[in-house]
Structures are given as structure tokens and as C-alpha cells.
Design a protein with these regions (language model features):
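Sequence/structural signature of beta-propeller domains
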Residues: 1-151
Length: 151
């Protein structure tokens, strides 16, 4: 019988529901859990490295409303430090940005097909973001006034 996850959670372990995306900056690691949370709409956990002996984990974001991110999946850190997250759900798939205080902004919505955004990353030479449409075999290059979008 598969009881290990329940046994470990009872002993204080943090359960992850469908962990799919992982990225890091200088101080933390972010993990997306696509179907985590009370509504199964997703969570993002943040592991903070305080010292060599101490690491903390926090529930950084949990989707609780329809107008919030729905099933976070692939993730990256933007050159300006925001978290950029792709959705993976059966409805409308979007691309979101989150600042360090948890504020969000919508970057894009896939109205072309029902395919999810995947493999989001930034050029090392400028602020151009690249993202794939999974089932269409397309890679999009997105650039522009990021400061205006983040307001």
C-alpha cells in the first residue's frame, strides 16, 4: 500500500501536488505545484536558503480565485527579478508575471489554440522572452515595454 506520502506529511513534511516547474535566483528556489491547494488550482512554494544550516519553505502563492493563475507549470526568473509562470489547464492558458510582493500581471493569453505555454526563458543578451506553444510546435519571441506591463 502506498502510504509513504501520508506518513511523511503526518511527520511534518511539506506535500507537493504535481510539482512541475522549478527555478532559482541567488537566494531561493521556486517550485510550482500544478494541481496543489484547496481548489486544486495550483501553488508555488519558495525555499529560502538562510544559511548553510537553515533552509525554510513557504507557501508563496496559492490560487484561490478564478481570476488568478490556474494550474502553474513552467517557471523562470525575469532579468528584473519577477517570477514568470506558464499555466497548464484545460481552459484558457495564460502567461503570468509575479513581483516579489506577490502582485501579479497578465503577460499573454493563448487565444490561438488550446495549447499550453511551455519552456519559458529569457535571452541572455536582452529582455526578449521566449516561450513555446506545446502542441503547435511554435516558439514565440516576446519583447516590449516590460515596465509598462508590470504596473
Amino acid at each position: 500500500e502506498d502510504t509513504m506520502r501520508f506518513d511523511l506529511a503526518a511527520k511534518g513534511a511539506t506535500p507537493f501536488a504535481r510539482p512541475e516547474g522549478i527555478t532559482s535566483d541567488q537566494a531561493s528556489i521556486y517550485v510550482t505545484c500544478t494541481s496543489g491547494g484547496k481548489l486544486n488550482k495550483g501553488q508555488i512554494f519558495k525555499l529560502n536558503f538562510i544559511s548553510q544550516q537553515k533552509t525554510t519553505i513557504e507557501l508563496w502563492l496559492e490560487s484561490e480565485k478564478d481570476d488568478q493563475i490556474n494550474m502553474p507549470d513552467n517557471v523562470t526568473i525575469a532579468p528584473w527579478g519577477d517570477l514568470i509562470v506558464c499555466e497548464d489547464n484545460s481552459k484558457i492558458n495564460r502567461l503570468w508575471g509575479f513581483n516579489q510582493t506577490g502582485g501579479s500581471y497578465l503577460i499573454a493569453e493563448n487565444s490561438y489554440t488550446g495549447s499550453e505555454f511551455a519552456g519559458v526563458c529569457f535571452s541572455p543578451f536582452d529582455n526578449t522572452m521566449y516561450v513555446n506553444l506545446q502542441y503547435n510546435g511554435m516558439t514565440l519571441a516576446i519583447d516590449g515595454n516590460w515596465k509598462k506591463l508590470r504596473r
